[in-house]
């Protein structure tokens, strides 16, 4: 989650479905937001919170939002449930925040070796409904996997994310690291994580390179 970004909108009223930010580049379509007040970040100090909104589109600094039901994982009709003041602080969550117990930080194994920030959560989604019939359906998740090529889980198995995907995924294989990740370094003393320029950016990859197999023919 990311906190502290400010609203730049003096007229964000109940029912509004758009709201202007200081910097729209810090958000992505799919983000889940909570709005606080001008003094406090939501969920940390009693500021207005508990109402969630999903970003459905972005135009420079203007976000289009929809109410989000964290229990069902679905959007609902209606805009803001309460007026949001200018300079209100925001708590921003990843689109799949509610699929995991908490944000990724450092795995226990890497921490014990003096490393940090290796942990990742990965979600595989049926983007267009071609597998399940429902676009956006979650196919599988991988919680707490590591960027460290020698990381182990609590059972002593490799926790290196390419190995976990190869061993347990029913839908994908790993091919290469994305450009902003530390490329499979050893865990001892290594600080992992995204590069600074992408610190708030969620990595999304659409699997568009495949083709349907050929139709079966007689041998």
Task: Name what the model sees in each region.
Residues 1-219:
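Surface-exposed assembly/interface segments
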